[in-house]
Amino acid sequence: MYKEIWTIGRILQWTEQYFQSKEMDTPRLDGEVLLSHVLEKNRIYLYTNYDQPLEQEELDRFRPLVIERAKGHSVASLTGTKDFMGLTFAVNDKVLIPRPDTETLVEYVLHTYHQQDSIRILDMCTGPGTILLSLLHYLPTATGMGLDISRDALEIATKNQEAFKLENRSEFHESDMFSYLEDHNELFDVIVSNPPYIRLEDKKILSPDVLNEPYIALFGGEDGLEFYRQLAMECVKYLKPYGLVAFEVGYDQAEDVKSLLESVGSYVDISFAADLAGINRVVTARVKG
């Protein structure tokens, strides 16, 4: 009896066409990443072994991933990992998936301080710990705290903390914004945050990938600025003199967040950091000394 043979090349071609029919943005790349995950090989391996037949067990693990991807689940949530700042983080469908935009925030802080600076960092709305752990990885004498209201996110953050062996320099706590710090008298050199900032009215234009991520990690109220208002008011209480704040913002929110910081009257040196496309995606400031 004839048994159909699926090679690496053939399955990738089929998957690309299938994802194209679903109008997915990166059909070829998605298929390659999912197959690499199943085979536990890098993507280069796929091209150097194009004619390699796949085992039935490999096909059985690959097909459900393709189906779930077509339903709108992100590749990262399906593979359980996401690369960020040259590091590989654990993720799942209960956390915000790290995006390249956020690297602009991390790179700004890394360029502001030296490796030997023993700074203390607070990461508000830490999610899977991506920002804080990246900073601690590249600033080997820094320490930090990550706060988040989501227990599911903190579970993944702790997993990443252990993977990078940063237990001695980082801590994660469940907290509704600054509530944890109300009982802990501590000041920080830096407060970073990538808070929820999508406007509620923009929900209808979001891709299925994004809508499958946790609601509480995405939306920042009617105008998207709800969390920035609280950050602007509260950060001054927990920063050392001339301490730094650095917030990721939506593509059109930089001026609005700047205005919020100005209205508080406690910040100086308010400025922007742009992404590779020249869009201001980070707002930074210093608290008055």
Can you say where each PLM-predicted feature lies in the sequence?
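Short helix-capping segments at alpha-helix termini
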Residues: 24, 139-141, 162-167, 238, ...
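C-terminal beta-strand of the catalytic ATP-binding
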Residues: 195-197, 286-289
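Conserved Class I SAM-dependent methyltransferase catalytic core
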Residues: 222-286
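Conserved SAM/SAH cofactor-binding pocket of Class I
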Residues: 104-204, 230
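Non-catalytic accessory regions of SAM-dependent methyltransferases
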Residues: 1-39, 45
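Conserved hydrophobic residues forming the short capping helix/wall of the S-adenosyl-L-methionine
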Residues: 19, 113, 161, 235, ...
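Conserved AdoMet
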Residues: 2, 35-111
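Mobile active-site "lid"/loop adjacent to the S-adenosyl-L-methionine
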Residues: 197-226
